[in-house]
């Protein structure tokens, strides 16, 4: 794969660091290091990594340091720096203004002749789909923890996502220069809260204001970071006062790795002293198996500990050939039988191309599609096929992205991440170079939205801009849903949280010149039944000529609490009372009828429709008959069932000074929260609670006022559970008032 010419790279200000900084490393020659003796970079020289963490742990600052030390950018800027430039990876104007990452940004760089593709992801729970997409296509990751905050609620979400996609990772405990930093506590939380077999690879030399450098436990040496920007790495003897601690921690590291690696375990039992290379190989094997997590230390803001972390990425994280990726082969005869096929990671054209579109974006270059290549070769000018739409696409342009800038390339191979232009597709689509191959990569896990608001443009003349912007956002973000409420004649948008929807409202105004009016947030309640209920329903329609006839018998069952968001259909029929070609029609009728519940108009979920028997007519039975029979059977069962309303419960984490503990606990109790745990460090306490989302609106204002602006909180979706009787009554009454079945109470405006 070629880059732009050397002159173009120089024009972009890449590949060179100012001589005045006393840079001690060789200048990176981008053009030269794109090639090996065979003409293509081997897999061993590639790493695809993501940087993920809780909000404000320092992910973007860390990425900025990585780009600077590898010669990718000539000057560093802070996320909320005084120069107003903002970090390179925060390319959206809104990101620079707020100092948070909203979209994943992709870039690539070089470290010690290895190509590193990096995706910097958001930490805020509302943008969790960006993290989900990044981890799906990466081979390894760096989990960033704050030395003060430790393991926080979004850290646990990222940990679950890494587990889902089996991503090996390193941990970097950042912000050792901050007051109250406690890396030992963060490590303990990794072991207790995340259940990781983790150990320090380094120990700090001083903490907070006295943080001078780190001690490398593998090589048994001290590492200092000199120069104005920490760019000169200097090695020295371990200070005398830290030698005993370094010996103890090194022994603990060997024990942890020996517990998860058989070869090192045997050496440990035989009381042999492992060499440095033995230890490194054992750590690599255990990290790739996800049975051990190496923990590194530093402070990205103070430019300490970043270069050893880069060395560790090369040393311990997998290259594309060490990760097994599977595609699903769907049979063409419409059978539900699926076969898993292992992708070949060879960097040549000996196998057909397979790639996954994991992110869509409309930038200044038009529609951008980010694709991870899993197999084969893709060249500029090639024709590829979208296996979902069965459409051919010719590639006019192929590029690699650096935040919002791009560099054209001629070809990409398995293991590369690239951007395609002007391609009509959806996030999660699979591309191949053979028509009707039936291959698809496992799709990205998309969580359901939990909050909705009504939205309309302030000016009626902006309707075209509004629909254009909303259409683009729904293509880019699968967690952002839009529908038109026919009863209230309004457009309703749904997403993962208030911030998520607020950001889209602001983007409509900034990017499309369409200011919007938003209504009050609405929670995505669900309805379900509390006990099994039988049904026996016949749909009959005779109006002269061919009629409609379908009979279904069975039982409607509630699902277990962990499956409250699901709907299941089970066919337990025998014989030919209901011909098999009509069973999918019954399922469709059931699913269609679940869109609106009888109690409050919200969706039905947590149900299993068990079809046991039925009847058909030789002439009058058809697909529509059994769709209507499925709908009628559900309505009949619900009329005889006891229903309850389910509400989303959020896992809330509040951090505030100790003197406000009483007020914070009282506030959570008032909001019907259940306190699940408590932590304390220095003068601050952390409260963990499960609180209904419906009761969390306006909490940020209350928390600020009761803690004098010193408290902060984060929350993420946890589960659905039956709501309180008072909440259920309130939700039902609001629905009856809105539909005119109940008079609106005096002094209360109709919602």
UniProtKB/Swiss-Prot annotation:
Gene3D superfamilies recorded: 3.30.230.10, 3.30.70.240, Elongation Factor G (Translational Gtpase), domain 3, P-loop containing nucleotide triphosphate hydrolases, Translation factors
Catalytic activity: GTP + H2O = GDP + phosphate + H(+)
Keywords of the record: Acetylation, Elongation factor, GTP-binding, Hydrolase, Mitochondrion, Nucleotide-binding, Phosphoprotein, Primary mitochondrial disease, Protein biosynthesis, Transit peptide
GO biological process: mitochondrial translational elongation
tr-type G domain residues: 44-321
Disease: Combined oxidative phosphorylation deficiency 1: A mitochondrial disease resulting in early rapidly progressive hepatoencephalopathy.
Family as reported in the entry's similarity comment: Belongs to the TRAFAC class translation factor GTPase superfamily. Classic translation factor GTPase family. EF-G/EF-2 subfamily.
Protein name: Elongation factor G, mitochondrial
Gene, per the UniProt record: GFM1
